[in-house]
A protein has these predicted regions:
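Generic hydrophobic alpha-helical segments
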Residues: 81, 162, 450-454, 531, ...
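Residues within alpha-helical segments
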Residues: 265, 269, 308, 507, ...
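Short acidic-hydrophobic, aromatic-tinged amphipathic segments that line or gate anion-handling sites
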Residues: 518-534
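Conserved SAM-binding loop
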Residues: 70, 499, 524
Length: 543
C-alpha cells in the first residue's frame, strides 16, 4: 500500500489535484442525497448513511485495489440491511457489518477475490434485478404518503401492507414525489453537470416548506434531528452470543459487498484502461466495514454509478475519493439542520430511479430470450431474491448453475472406440484388445457416462483395455470412484487396463486414490503404440 501511494505522489501535480478536487466535490454532492435515501430505505436514520459515506469512502480510497473506486452505502444492500434491522435491530446491524468487514479482509488475504469473478452472470443479474424490484416496490408507500404501515422482511407482506393502507394516501406526498420525479428526468438534459437528485431535494423541500409545511412527513418528523457534529466513536457489542446469531447476515453482507465492489472496479478498469487488484480491493472494503460501524455507519461497498461519475469528471487518482469523503463530512457539519426539512416523499423517486438503473433490463431480457440453462438460473435467482431472500437465491442460483454446467460439460466429454485395424493390431488379436480415446475432464458430471461406456466394452471380455487419456486434464474424486469400479470388474474377469498419455495432474489423482498402484506402474505408457506392443507380446506369450 505504501508503494502504491508513493508511486501516486511521485508524479502528482497541482493540475492533477485540481481535477481530483472537482471530481471529489461533484461525487460528494451526488453521494449525500443517496446516502440519506439508502439509510432511510434500510430502516435507519439518515445520518448513518452519511457516516458510512464519508468513513468508508475515505478508507476504501486509501486502502482499496482500485484507485478510482468510490465507496459508500448502495441500493443493493437495502433489502439485506432492512431485513437485519427488522429482525435484530440497528445495534446488531453494526455488529454484522463489522463481522462482514473481517470476512472481506480474510477473503482478500486468502486471495478469494479472483474466485468471486467466477460467479455466473445469470446469478448476479438475477439477484440484482430482484433487489431492484424490491427497492422500487418498497418505495411505493413513501411515494403515495401512506401512513400506519408496518415494515416487514417479506416482500409479499410489504405489498399487502401497501394494499391495506391505500386509502391513507396523501395528496401532498404524491405531488412532491411527482415534482421530484420530473426533476430527475428533466434536469440531466438541461444541466447535466449538476446532480439531479440534489436539485430534486432542494426544489421539493423549498416547495413543501413554503406552501404546505407540516402537511407531509419529513426527515425531522420521522427520525428527529440530524446531529451536525462528527459521529462519536463507539465499539459495537461484539459478544460471542451476538456474533454467533449474526454469522449468516454477516456472510451475506460480505459476499454482496465483495461482488459489488469488484464489479465496480471492473467498470473503472474499462473506463480508464487500468487494472485493479481484486484481493487488495477486498481488504480495503473489509477495513472500511470494520471501522465504519465504530462511527455508527451502515455497511458500504463500491458504488458503480458514483465511481463512473468520479472518472467522467476527471479524477486522476485516489485523492478524489478522499476528497469526496471529506466533502460529505463537511456538508453534514454545515447543512444538517436544513436536511431535517426534506420530505420523505422526495426520497422515493430517487430510490425508484436507482432501482430502475440497477435493474440490468437489457441483459435480463437478452438472457430470457436465450431460452437456455442460463435463463432458468436467471429466473430462479430473480424470483427467490424477491419472494424468499438474497441468501437463498444466491445459494440456489449457484447450485443450479453448477449442476447445469456439470451436465453440459459431461455431455461434451467424448469416448471413442478405435477399430483394431486402425490401431495396427495383429488380426488374430483383434478381439482381445480394446482401445478407447477419452477427451475431456473426468469429473462428477461425466463420470457415470465414462463408466457406462467402458463397462459395455469390457462385457465383450477383451484381455487388454487400452485407455488413451492424453486429452483428460483432470480426474476428480467422483470419477476416481467409478474408475475403481471399472478396474475391479475388469480384474475379476482376468483383464488388464493399460493407460497411455496420462497428464501429470491426472496421474497424481490416480496415485492419491490408490488406483495407480492397483493398475501397476508398468501398465502406464507415454504412447499408444507402446501399450499395443506390450499387450501383443503378453498375448503371444500366452499371458
Amino acid at each position: 500500500m505504501k508503494k502504491v501511494w508513493l508511486n501516486s505522489v511521485k508524479d502528482y501535480t497541482w493540475a492533477r489535484f485540481r481535477k481530483d478536487l472537482l471530481a471529489g466535490i461533484i461525487v460528494g454532492i451526488i453521494a449525500l442525497p443517496l446516502a440519506m435515501s439508502f439509510a432511510i430505505a434500510s430502516g435507519v436514520s439518515p445520518e448513518y448513511g452519511i457516516y458510512s459515506s464519508f468513513v468508508a469512502g475515505i478508507i476504501v480510497s486509501i486502502f482499496g485495489g482500485s484507485k478510482f473506486q468510490i465507496a459508500g452505502p448502495t441500493g443493493a444492500f437495502i433489502p439485506v440491511l432492512l431485513g437485519i434491522v427488522l429482525t435484530y435491530g440497528y445495534q446488531d446491524l453494526l455488529v454484522a457489518g463489522m463481522m462482514a468487514g473481517v470476512l472481506l479482509c480474510l477473503m482478500g488475504i486468502f486471495k478469494i477475490g479472483t474466485l468471486i469473478k467466477f460467479i455466473p452472470r445469470p446469478v448476479t443479474i438475477g439477484f440484482t434485478a430482484g433487489i431492484a424490484v424490491t427497492i422500487f416496490m418498497g418505495q411505493v408507500g413513501n411515494f403515495l404518503g401512506l401512513t400506519g404501515m408496518e415494515k416487514h422482511e417479506s416482500f409479499v407482506a410489504n405489498m399487502n401492507e401497501i394494499w391495506l393502507h391505500l386509502d391513507s394516501w396523501n395528496f401532498y406526498s404524491v405531488f412532491i414525489s411527482c415534482i421530484c420525479m420530473l426533476v430527475l428526468f428533466i434536469f440531466p438534459k438541461i444541466l447535466p453537470r449538476i446532480p439531479a437528485p440534489l436539485i430534486g431535494l432542494v426544489i421539493t423541500t423549498a416547495i413543501a416548506m413554503l406552501f404546505f409545511p407540516d402537511a407531509l412527513p419529513t426527515i425531522g418528523s420521522a427520525y428527529g434531528d440530524i446531529p451536525s457534529t462528527f459521529p462519536p466513536f463507539e465499539f459495537p457489542d461484539m459478544t460471542f452470543a451476538n456474533m454467533s446469531k449474526l454469522i449468516g447476515p454477516a456472510f451475506v453482507i460480505a459476499m454482496l459487498g465483495g461482488i459489488e465492489s469488484l464489479l465496480s472496479a471492473v467498470v473503472a478498469d474499462g473506463m480508464t484502461n487500468t487494472k485493479h487488484n481484486s484481493n487488495r480491493e477486498l481488504i480495503g472494503q473489509g477495513i472500511a466495514n470494520i471501522v465504519t460501524p465504530m462511527f455508527g455507519g451502515i455497511p458500504a461497498t463500491g458504488a458503480i454509478a458514483r465511481t463512473a461519475t468520479n472518472i467522467n469528471n476527471g479524477a486522476t487518482s485516489r485523492v478524489s475519493g478522499v476528497i469526496h469523503g471529506i466533502f460529505v463530512l463537511l456538508t453534514l457539519l454545515v447543512l444538517a439542520p436544513v436536511a431535517v426539512n426534506i420530505p420523505i416523499a422526495a426520497m422515493a423517486p430517487i430510490l425508484m430511479l436507482v432501482a430502475w438503473n440497477m435493474s440490468e433490463r437489457k441483459t435480463f431480457q437478452h438472457i430470457i430470450k436465450l431460452k437456455s440453462g442460463d435463463t432458468l438460473v436467471l429466473i430462479i435467482t430473480f424470483l427467490l431474491t424477491v419472494f424468499a431472500s438474497l441468501t437463498v437465491s444466491v445459494e440456489v442460483g449457484l447450485l443450479l448453475a453448477v449442476v447445469l454446467f456439470a451436465k453440459q460439460m459431461g455431455s461434451s466429454m467424448q469416448i471413442e472406440e478405435i477399430e483394431p485395424e486402425g490401431a495396427e493390431i495383429a488380426p488374430h488379436l483383434h478381439e482381445k484388445i480394446s482401445i478407447f480415446t477419452i477427451r475431456g475432464p473426468l469429473f462428477f458430471g461425466a463420470a457415470q457416462i465414462f463408466q457406462q461406456n467402458i463397462i459395455k466394452a469390457i462385457h465383450v471380455k477383451p484381455k487388454y483395455l487400452i485407455l488413451r487419456m492424453g486429452k483428460v486434464p483432470i480426474i476428480d474424486a467422483t470419477a476416481e470412484g467409478y474408475f475403481h469400479q471399472i478396474e475391479k470388474e475388469f480384474s475379476k474377469q482376468g483383464g488388464q487396463i493399460l493407460i497411455t498419455g496420462l497428464t501429470d495432474k491426472a496421474k497424481e489423482s490416480l496415485k492419491g486414490s490408490g488406483l495407480y498402484d492397483r493398475i501397476g506402474e508398468e501398465h502406464f505408457f507415454s504412447h499408444t503404440e507402446d501399450a499395443i506392443h506390450y499387450a501383443e507380446n503378453a498375448l503371444n506369450k500366452g499371458d
